[in-house]
């Protein structure tokens, strides 16, 4: 994030597509034989959002690598797009799905999911989880609370 802030022509903002490309490049180094696909719409995102968003994506991809494909390797997809005044980020796989009866709000939920929910709260977003035997889908919807000052755009 710091590198992207330094390179950005908009103080305090990062280009989301570049940030996601770099994040996914680094994540691919720890995915073993899994295939990681990443895509993002081009948009500017405040550093206040980029840092927790990067941590959240890292945690969800790490969980997919650990648990989604117990029988071998598979695909994990990360996408980000702007919808109205919201950023929607999706992390999905086609693996085993979450354990039956899994409730992210229960105390027995993993530390990783507690980190995820902490980041969701920090981002003032909503997280929707869909899971079955064909995989899991985590959809984060967060408001875009700040934009760069239009008078400073080059």
Predicted regions and their residues:
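Detector for a conserved hydrophobic position within an alpha-helical segment of the HATPase_c
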Residues: 120-121
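Conserved short strand/loop->alpha-helix "switch" segment adjacent to the catalytic nucleotide/phosphoryl-transfer site
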Residues: 28-75
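C-terminal end segment of the histidine kinase catalytic
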Residues: 135-154
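Short beta-to-alpha transition helix within the HATPase_c
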Residues: 4, 10-29, 81
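Glycine-rich/acidic phosphate-handling loop/turn and adjacent ATP-lid/helix
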Residues: 87-113
């Amino acid at each position: 994030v710091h590198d992207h802030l330094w390179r950005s022509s908009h103080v305090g903002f990062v280009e989301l597509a570049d940030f996601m490309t770099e994040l996914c490049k680094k994540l691919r180094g720890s995915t073993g034989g899994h295939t990681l696909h990443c895509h993002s719409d081009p948009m500017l995102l405040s550093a206040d959002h980029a840092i927790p968003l990067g941590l959240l994506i890292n945690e969800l991809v790490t969980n997919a690598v650990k648990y989604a494909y117990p029988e071998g390797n598979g695909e994990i997809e990360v996408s980000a797009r702007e919808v109205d005044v919201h950023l929607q980020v999706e992390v999905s796989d086609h693996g085993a799905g979450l354990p039956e009866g899994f409730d992210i709000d229960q105390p027995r939920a993993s530390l990783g999911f507690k980190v995820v929910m902490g980041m969701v709260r920090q981002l003032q977003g909503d997280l929707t989880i869909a899971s079955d035997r064909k995989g899991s889908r985590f959809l984060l919807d967060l408001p875009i609370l700040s934009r760069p000052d239009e008078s400073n755009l080059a």
